[in-house]
From Swiss-Prot:
The active site is at residue 64. This is Protein-L-isoaspartate O-methyltransferase. It comes from Rhodopseudomonas palustris (strain BisB5). It catalyses: [protein]-L-isoaspartate + S-adenosyl-L-methionine = [protein]-L-isoaspartate alpha-methyl ester + S-adenosyl-L-homocysteine. The keyword Cytoplasm applies. Belongs to the methyltransferase superfamily. L-isoaspartyl/D-aspartyl protein methyltransferase family. One of its GO terms (molecular function) is protein-L-isoaspartate (D-aspartate) O-methyltransferase activity. Its EC number is 2.1.1.77. Catalyzes the methyl esterification of L-isoaspartyl residues in peptides and proteins that result from spontaneous decomposition of normal L-aspartyl and L-asparaginyl residues. It plays a role in the repair and/or degradation of damaged proteins. The gene is pcm. GO terms for biological process: methylation; protein modification process; protein repair. One of its GO terms (cellular component) is cytoplasm. It is found in: Cytoplasm. The keyword 4Fe-4S does not apply. Transmembrane segments: none annotated.
Amino acid sequence: MVSSVAPPPEKMMFQLSLRRRGISDRAVLQAMEAVPRDRFVDPVHRDGAWRDTALPIACGQTISQPFVVAYMTEQLRLEAGHRLLEIGTGSGYHAAVLSRLVRDVVSVERFKTLADRARARLKELNYANVEVLLGDGFAIPEGAGTFDRIIVTAAMTELSQPLLDLLDPGGILIAPIGPANGRQTLIRVERKDDDFIRKALVDVRFVPALTGIAREL
């Protein structure tokens, strides 16, 4: 895996910003520091790659604010042996962070352009335990199996039972829930046998999750 080579002052400020905002998990901080965010943003935005802000990418999507990436990752309580499903690959940045903390990442992206670019970028940077699939995040194939952890990186209006059923007992799902132009809340769901225990975490703002596959974009 390629590690970040950001100039020391930028990297130090990046880490300090995350710590000041409450990120304390050492493994998460190390993963955030190691992944070269500047390699996942468009060239025109690379000067701002290490700032704590979301940035636009292709297909009207965004690469999430680093604090949000770190916070969601921390809330997943990841372990090295976990198998994780990500819905919404985007640039591939969050998948790269997650890949340093778990055994396998399966990431589903509905936009062909984003899926192809993320797959190529992750391969170039040697993130070998990430599989990027072109697909509909609302219709994960049964053959995908089940997962220890699930993360959704676009806002859904609700969580479907088929998605919850992909979570192994003892597993955790993190997702932003709410309308595209209204209040959204980051939700953590823990599966206890056949019960799904929900907890509201923080208010957030994400692009909306869309159904279908955009093969022409």
